[in-house]
C-alpha cells in the first residue's frame, strides 16, 4: 500500500482526528472495491498510524430514487465477496442491508460517535455529494 496523494484527500469538516476513538471507520459508498481504492487506503494508513482497528462499513439503502433489483444484486454480490476476502484480514467488515426505507437511519452517526475519524469515498456523481453533505453534519 503506497501513501495516498494529498490531492486525493479532502476534509469535509474541521473536526480533528480523535486519538481516543475506538477505531477508524471507512464508510464504503461509491468505490465499492477493496483494491485501487484511495479512501480505503487512506483509512488503513490512518488506522495503522493511530494503532487502531479499521472498521469497513458498507451499507445498501432500500428506498432511494435509483434503487433497482439489478443494481442491488450487483452490490450484494460485491458485499459477499468483500466478506469472503476480509474474513482472513485484520479488519472488521460491517455490511448492512436496510430491510425497509429508513431502517438504517442513524447507524452511520452511531458508528461515527466511537470513531477516531470517518473516511469515505468522494465522487461527484450519483447521490454521493448529498451523502457527504449529510455526513459532514454528524
Q: What are these regions, as identified by a protein language model?
A:
Residues 1-138:
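Trp/Phe/Arg-rich N-terminal binding region typifying the photolyase-homology
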